[in-house]
Structure formats: structure tokens, C-alpha cells
Design a protein with these regions (language model features):
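Cysteine/selenocysteine-centered motifs that mediate thiol-based redox chemistry or coordinate metal-sulfur cofactors
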Residues: 42, 97-119
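A short, polar/charged loop-to-alpha-helix boundary motif
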Residues: 84-102
Length: 119
């Protein structure tokens, strides 16, 4: 059975390294919603063997790891290296996070009842 990659890895343009862009995007999601984010990524290489589904082509993907956890403002609290396997954890004061969300007013003008279906 074919399994597609489920993490960020090799680039379509070989001279590009999107790791820092990926981190900044995730930090932005955290900051814009005032919630901590746990961003997990694989490490190592995954080889794609020739099969009918890929027209007999082989390739490989190199995953750049670099998993991290942000606080509610998007600041990285703890991170891992590109080849580092393991676990990381962080503790947050949930009451303080809720207070921060309420005091910033980021959600005040959102109107979810007006959102249409995506699909």
C-alpha cells in the first residue's frame, strides 16, 4: 500500500530551504490566535520506490525535523534540531492564556455565523 509523506521535507526547488519560513508561518498562526502551537515534524529520509502509481519512478524526501512549541504570542519556547529525534513539552497557564485572548480583543470582531461552508 502506498503511503504519502505526512511532514515537511525536501523542496521542489533544490536550492530552497523552507524550514525558517515554515516556522514563521506556524509562529504567526500562534500569535494571530493567541494559542500555543506544537509543531511536530519528521526527521530522516524516506525513499519512494518505483511502482505503477508513480510511473515507475524512484525518489526520496529528506525531512528537516526542527519541531518546536510556541507560547500564546508565537515565541518559540523549546525546539529540536534538524536531525534530532525525541519529545519536547511545555507547560502553560490556561487561565492566563484565556485572559490574554480576552484582553487583546482579537476575536471581538469575528462573525463566525457569517462564514460559509468551505466544501
Amino acid at each position: 500500500k502506498r503511503q504519502d509523506p505526512t511532514a515537511i521535507g525536501s523542496e521542489p526547488i533544490l536550492s530552497t530551504d523552507s524550514m525558517s519560513h515554515w516556522r514563521r508561518c506556524m509562529q504567526g498562526h500562534s500569535a494571530s490566535n493567541l494559542v500555543p502551537v506544537v509543531a511536530a515534524n519528521r526527521v530522516g529520509e524516506e525513499r519512494v520506490e518505483p511502482c505503477a502509481e508513480n510511473a515507475g519512478q524512484s525518489s526520496s524526501l529528506v525531512f528537516y525535523g526542527s519541531s518546536f512549541i510556541t507560547d500564546g504570542c508565537g515565541e518559540i519556547q523549546i525546539s529540536m534540531g534538524r536531525q534530532e529525534e525525541g519529545f519536547i513539552a511545555a507547560t502553560f497557564d490556561l487561565d492566563q492564556l484565556m485572559e490574554d485572548r480576552l484582553s487583546w480583543g482579537l476575536f471581538r470582531d469575528r462573525r463566525p455565523e457569517m462564514y460559509g461552508k468551505l466544501l
